[in-house]
């Protein structure tokens, strides 16, 4: 890293959607609206290259300001989150795996006003993949997870993450 001491961080170019897919956001895409806005075309292009996705997964982490990024050599590429920093897959045995492939142990279950189910784990906070909500319901019915209700707007503050590092940067620069 000392070889490239002044490499600027990258904001607004990478997004993680609510299903655990990565998206590249070029200038044209960014001009259409924020990644999480739902505006047509604002999500950008879904990454398909498996080795690139694996590289992102291996280097995906959080800074001291609760902003998620992946370390690309000397540069941090900050991630725009559609929902949460992690997207969980739940196995039939109620095992939990992050979109990054890492196993996780649920510590808390949360349900928002829209019925979306989240887990807080030792890795961090994340949304359960929509395809796995029926399995999550079984875990709740079995008493393995006891959900608490929370409003979507309160999730980032309560669980310590920034959904849009790019927007935070713009706010700080004003």
Segments predicted by a language model, with ranges:
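Short, extreme N-terminal leader segments that mark the start of a protein/domain
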Residues: 1-23
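Acidic surface patches and DE-rich sequence motifs
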Residues: 6, 17, 26, 91, ...
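Charge-rich alpha-helical segments
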Residues: 7, 76-88, 131-134
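Residue-level detector of beta-strand structural context in well-folded domains
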Residues: 12, 66-68, 107, 117
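Short, exposed beta-strand/loop patches in secreted or surface proteins that constitute
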Residues: 15-16, 59-61, 86-88, 106-111
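Short, well-structured hydrophobic secondary-structure segments
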Residues: 21-25, 32-85
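Surface-exposed beta-loop interaction hotspot
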Residues: 84-107
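Glycine-rich, aromatic-bearing surface loops/beta-hairpins
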Residues: 97, 105-174
């Amino acid at each position: 890293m000392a070889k490239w001491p002044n490499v600027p961080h990258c904001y607004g170019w990478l997004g993680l959607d609510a299903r655990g897919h990565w998206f590249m956001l070029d200038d044209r895409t960014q001009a259409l609206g924020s990644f999480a806005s739902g505006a047509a075309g604002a999500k950008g292009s879904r990454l398909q290259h498996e080795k690139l996705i694996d590289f992102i997964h291996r280097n995906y982490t959080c800074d001291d300001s609760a902003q998620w990024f992946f370390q690309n050599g000397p540069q941090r590429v900050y991630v725009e989150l559609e929902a949460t920093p992690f997207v969980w897959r739940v196995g039939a045995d109620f095992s939990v795996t992050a979109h990054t492939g890492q196993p996780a142990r649920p510590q808390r279950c949360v349900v928002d006003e829209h019925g979306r189910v989240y887990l807080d784990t030792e890795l961090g906070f994340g949304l359960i993949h929509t395809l796995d909500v029926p399995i999550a319901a079984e875990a709740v019915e079995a008493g393995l997870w006891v959900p608490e209700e929370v409003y979507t707007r309160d999730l980032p503050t309560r669980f310590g993450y920034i959904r849009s590092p790019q927007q935070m940067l713009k706010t700080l620069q004003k």
